[in-house]
């Protein structure tokens, strides 16, 4: 199972990530404005206005003593100003928190929908080449990346920009020389941080990719825990996990070392800045005649600015992590859909159910050059006809059914249903006209009732029970303590193979689609279970166009027609009796069967 694109983070990926984040953010322009306003206003009032008023108080104290009975008269306006500044500042602080919550909740909702829609509409080829656990992890990291970026923007980036502007604007008229030196130090500081950012960004992306792979390895082992245990391969899986864990740890370590190097250098620049401001504060009055209040203001503003600049390192680190976390899902979202509907694609209308495979050519995307499954295959299935597909493994039986369902697009030829090209119709309308029962029952970790009704969610309890009865599933469902409300576990692990298959068949019965595809639908059943289901399947197929894939030839012997495939070609076509009498490939397969199974 490959993990796609773990290369270092590229500028184009960063731009696309930021564009996607902005697309969901700009849907709330008022909240965005309030978040910027509250962040800038909060810093201006509680950091700069507060200090400015205190500087005025210091200057007034320095101007001369004030009698006790005149304190409120003299300092009353200053006290009132401080109270108002802090009151409004605290209100803006809470508004800042509120807007962040609103942005993150709404943004993550839209991003989750975007990821779900993208993943659910991607082709089966896309999903079979990836770990499901990694996709879940990438979705979670994509959302946490958005949350992290909103946090760092509102709580760090905007306050830092506000601090730089206010500090330079306040100090330039008072100490222009010091302001020039301060600006030069800031330029050097920001340039260094930017260079380190460009170095650390790909390291963060590599760390995120390693952690996603770790999640995929863990998910793969947990999902297939029965195979791990029955094969006694716990140690092997632990070694795989340890290798992925070490890779994630090593990636984290490399990233951490780069961050520590950056932090040491930026701390040195902060120390230099504070040394310069200390000299100016100490000699400011003697050299420039600056008042005590102004010296307090200079020191406080500069100190606050250096603290903000000190946060720039951690701010860039958080931006690195946020964009690195989001990078892999951004690439997934950017991938073209391998199977996509035309913008104006009509819905498929099935009136009879005739199926035609016309001059079909198909090869899997990861196949070697010149290695195809079908090359100019043509097959007609009349409306209402029951057709069995048989042949050795790899002959193309299941692939043909997948092309009918348009789980992949053909490279040449057409698949028609009632004369309509399925590639020109919407995928959803096509699949709602086909009841599909695969070899491995596809059950959700939900109740038996919900699983049966999945293809027809508006079905009544009576209809659900009747479908289960026809699939001979009620005989085990009624014995369960919670009956139809029994949770089946992930992929139906709480049920036996035969029970899972009967639930899947009940779903197909309830769907009542005009076309039926059975892909080894009874292969997981024991002889007793198969006997219970066979009659239900015969009733289900009556009056429906049915394609039955089987290795167990007794499953298809009674069908209207049997098509024998070999190496992607039709080598025989006829009824069971005709094919046995012909003495060809089918007769050979029939004669070699033991226990009703086709020799692999």
Identify the residue ranges that each predicted region occupies.
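Membrane-integrated ABC transporters
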Residues: 1-47, 61-79, 92-100, 104, ...
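ABC-type nucleotide-binding domain
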Residues: 348-600
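An intracellular "coupling" helix at the cytosolic face of ABC transporter transmembrane type-1 domains
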Residues: 26-29, 124-128, 141-150, 154, ...
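Alpha-helical segments in transporter systems
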Residues: 30-52, 78, 82, 97-101, ...
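Cytosolic ends of transmembrane helices, especially the final helix of ABC transmembrane type-1 domains
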Residues: 233, 257, 304-332
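Short intracellular "coupling" helices and adjacent cytoplasmic loop segments at the cytosolic face
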Residues: 2-9, 105, 113-137, 141-143, ...
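Transmembrane helices of ABC transporter permease
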Residues: 31-43, 78, 85, 155-206, ...
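Hydrophobic alpha-helical segments in the permease module
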Residues: 78-89, 93, 186-189, 259-279, ...
